[in-house]
């Protein structure tokens, strides 16, 4: 049964998605599992970075997964300056609305002029709320999409900090921000980082060790964000218990230091 499904998933990915070389079985299964994590509500969004496929190719692929009976909810494909995100609109809208009513966004300022990362000042919150409201205003109309359907939308050249907006859409517990008016570089080089990786087995398609989340928090602000990280982990575990696509959830923490972060 699993072997037959694996072949169907590989065939669907190779048929619909553009790639310079033939996609392997492992990559095809990882891709399908990441989309299933969005569909079942484990996370609100998936940033598509597997191939150079365009919106219509990805749309065709998602419809093929629906034909296979794997996707049961409505998914939205959002194209932001050629970056493609696959969104569970209901979950994303709920999370963005929560952020709009919060004064503590758990943002980490990594502007290049800082000697080390620090929590974002409260006087930046109104500007970030305005960008969140614009993003919410774009995706909320798609909330009425029918189950087992795919919608498509695009945003051209938004005056947003895309790093921050993508972090919100991906529901990272702590998201990076930097002052775009003073440049797009950051102060993360040689900064000790705590790397969080969330993985689980996708029993729905018989695939092991699927990465669901991966994000970093600078060690210098870890203590200040620890309570929120624990709350985020509890919320994730609750969402995990409410679905039946994935089993054996693991949250893994490591410490790393990189020479340069873009």
From Swiss-Prot:
Cross-referenced InterPro entries: DUF4504
Transmembrane segments: none
Family matches, as Pfam families: DUF4504
Coiled coil spans: none
Top-level division of the source organism's lineage: Eukaryota
Family label: Belongs to the UPF0739 family.
Protein name: UPF0739 protein C1orf74 homolog
The species this protein was found in: Xenopus laevis
Lineage of producing organism: Eukaryota, Metazoa, Chordata, Craniata, Vertebrata
């Amino acid at each position: 049964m699993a072997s037959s499904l694996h072949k169907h998933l590989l065939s669907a990915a190779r048929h619909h998605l553009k790639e310079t070389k033939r996609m392997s079985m492992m990559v095809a299964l990882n891709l399908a599992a990441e989309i299933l994590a969005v569909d079942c509500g484990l996370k609100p969004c998936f940033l598509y970075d597997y191939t150079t496929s365009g919106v219509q190719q990805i749309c065709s692929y998602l419809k093929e997964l629906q034909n296979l009976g794997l996707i049961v909810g409505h998914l939205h494909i959002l194209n932001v300056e050629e970056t493609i995100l696959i969104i569970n609109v209901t979950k994303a809208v709920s999370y963005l609305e929560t952020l709009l009513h919060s004064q503590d966004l758990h943002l980490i300022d990594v502007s290049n002029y800082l000697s080390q990362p620090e929590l974002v000042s409260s006087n930046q919150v109104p500007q970030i709320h305005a960008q969140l409201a614009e993003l919410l205003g774009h995706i909320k109309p798609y909330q009425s999409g029918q189950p087992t359907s795919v919608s498509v939308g695009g945003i051209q050249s938004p005056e947003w900090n895309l790093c921050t907006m993508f972090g919100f859409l991906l529901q990272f517990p702590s998201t990076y921000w930097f002052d775009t008016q003073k440049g797009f570089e950051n102060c993360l080089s040689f900064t000790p980082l705590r790397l969080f990786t969330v993985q689980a087995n996708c029993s729905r398609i018989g695939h092991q060790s699927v990465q669901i989340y991966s994000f970093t928090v600078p060690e210098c602000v870890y203590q200040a964000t620890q309570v929120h990280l624990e709350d985020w982990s509890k919320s994730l575990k609750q969402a995990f218990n409410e679905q039946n696509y994935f089993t054996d959830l693991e949250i893994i923490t490591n410490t790393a230091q990189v020479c340069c972060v873009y």
